[in-house]
Amino acid sequence: PCESFLKSELEDGTLLSKLTAEKVDFVVLAGFLLKIPDEMLTVFPDKIVNIHPSLLPKYGGKGMYGMKVHEAVVAAGEKESGITIHIIDDHYDEGSVVFQTTVPVLPTDTPEDVAHKVHELEYKYFPQVIDEMISKL
């Protein structure tokens, strides 16, 4: 199932109650910007996965998302960027890396160009990696 929720439901435990009531085994986040509460991490150890639009640990952490990441990659003159699919832990973008792949960043690339390349990686690999992870449950 796919569930929408309010930030307050994440913070007050309502979401966790819903997930456990539905007997959810695995949680998939996509560019999720909020910190997951410790209690939820305890109930779902190594079973909450997220995707980040850079090659972590570069360009990760609180406040690094979307175009901010791609702008930083271009500003730093990076030769490559990519995606990281990782397990959520109690720190922003520091969980165990499940999968990474890269794309070249050309000297002529704009942040929008990099974003397009990274989105293509996300569309291709995120569903595949999720399927592989679920098959191992």
Model-derived segments and their meaning:
Residues 1-137:
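One-carbon transfer enzymes
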